[in-house]
Design a protein with these regions (language model features):
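Extended, folded domain segments that form the structural surfaces/walls around functional sites
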Residues: 4, 191, 203, 296, ...
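Glycine-rich phosphate-binding loop of actin/hexokinase-like ATP-binding domains
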Residues: 197-239
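Glycine-rich phosphate-binding/hydrolytic loop that grips phosphoryl groups
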Residues: 346-396
Length: 410
């Protein structure tokens, strides 16, 4: 079982692993996130979020059958303060000295300690090993001089994790199995070993966009940008004088399509105002709004990529996923803005043919990625036989109490 707690939507998914290589997705339930309850991936109003999640889990359990009880759930962590921080540590190596695993573990702990106290370290990955200014493949091969290790330290504000734990703890009879780094699990889901020689996975969410960079087969960097599809919708509401429903509908139907194409059509005809006034929206203005915000998002994505690698070293380019990718010509527009090749990623090959169809949609890549990484079981099965024996046991105990009550009159 996995849950996504996003700015715009809450979603839960149930799946069974097949040979540890694919997922049989059994059911998906989703609904809009209660308004202003999650901001930039951080739970702000846990009571409302818990109530909505509990309702979704009940629906999910009903789909799985009366005998199935959901006891645990995995959650993807995707807050805007989630990122990797590069940290370098070094130590001297005496001539003839062999580095042990314990010595390397000490270096990793030193890297962890370099982050501020308000940050929670989620994971530490060695990116490069250098000895006497030369890159080495294996640190154990260093037998003298010095060793410098650069780590990618995955971290997030500690209160983000605390709020997530508090939220899940309020779910009745359902514990947190684990929280996983969503940008990383999604990126690993959508890439091949060849892709990871040089690529960036960009996940366009509603409130946040994540970017995960792989170079030379290893994860080099990831970050979450607090901008996403909701911001395009908000711009259309403001500049087009539209309702939220109108703005979201136009964005999904025409946003990227009209941003890229010349069309003889000059205006969108909107529903009349309450006083009968005719309402229209210039397609030129519509295009400018969509492209301006998307350009801003892609610009920040490219800045994060530049932190660790020149964009011309991304041999596999940008791999896109998330809600915005459902719009026509998304990859073409993004490639034009970024100056790097781009394509829409797919996780359908990880799913069995009998999985529910919606699970293959890009907006569910995060949930599928989290489930692929989860290892423990999340349900218990109650047999009818056990339920009957439990009922008989209760009746038996009631009988004993009744016997005790009347024993004094014997």
């Amino acid at each position: 079982m996995a849950a996504e707690i996003g700015n715009a939507k809450l979603a839960v998914m149930a799946a069974r692993k097949v040979d540890d290589k694919r997922l049989h997705v059994l059911a998906v339930e989703t609904e809009p996130t209660p308004k202003n309850c999650v901001r930039n991936g951080v739970v702000c109003k846990p009571t409302e979020v818990v109530a909505a999640l509990n309702g979704l889990l009940k629906k999910l359990a009903n789909r799985l059958g009366a005998s199935v009880v959901i006891t645990k759930i995995y959650v993807g962590l995707n807050a805007h303060t989630l990122r990797t921080t590069p940290v370098s540590v070094s130590r001297s190596v005496f001539d003839g000295e062999r580095l042990t695993d314990d010595m390397l573990a000490d270096l990793e702990q030193e890297a962890r300690r370099q982050l501020p106290a308000e940050k929670q370290v989620l994971e530490v990955s060695a990116v490069t090993y250098m000895s006497n200014d030369n890159v080495v493949a294996q640190p154990h091969d260093v037998t003298g001089g010095s060793l410098q290790v650069t780590y990618a330290v995955a971290n997030v504000d500690a209160d983000v994790v605390d709020k997530l734990k508090q939220c899940v703890a309020q779910l009745p009879a359902c514990a947190l199995a684990d929280y996983l780094i969503a940008p990383k699990t999604t990126a690993e889901l959508l890439t091949t070993p060849d892709d990871r020689q040089g690529c960036a996975v960009v996940d366009f969410g509603a409130g946040c966009t994540s970017v995960t960079v792989f170079v030379d087969g290893a994860l080099k960097h990831f970050a979450v940008i607090p901008l996403g599809g909701q911001h395009i919708t908000a711009d259309l509401i403001t500049f087009g004088n539209l309702s939220e429903y109108e703005a979201e509908s136009l964005k999904r139907q025409f946003g990227i399509k009209y941003a890229d194409e010349n069309t003889a059509k000059k205006y969108f005809q909107m529903a009349d105002a309450s006083d009968g006034t005719k309402r229209t929206l210039s397609i030129d203005d519509f295009k400018k709004v969509c492209v301006a915000r998307l350009t801003e998002i892609v610009k920040y994505v490219m800045e994060q990529i530049a932190v660790c690698v020149p964009s011309d070293q991304l041999s596999a380019g940008l791999i896109l996923t998330g809600g915005l990718t459902t719009m026509d010509n998304c990859a073409k527009i993004v490639a034009g803005i970024a100056g790097v090749s781009a394509r829409i990623g797919s996780h359908a090959h990880w799913l069995t043919p009998d999985s529910v169809k919606q699970a293959s949609h890009n907006e569910y890549a995060q949930l599928v990625g989290v489930l692929m990484q989860g290892n423990g079981g999340c349900v218990e099965t109650q047999s009818k036989k056990k339920k009957r024996s439990g009922f008989k046991e209760i009746i038996g105990k009631m009988g004993e109490k009744m016997e005790d009550m009347f024993s004094e009159y014997k």
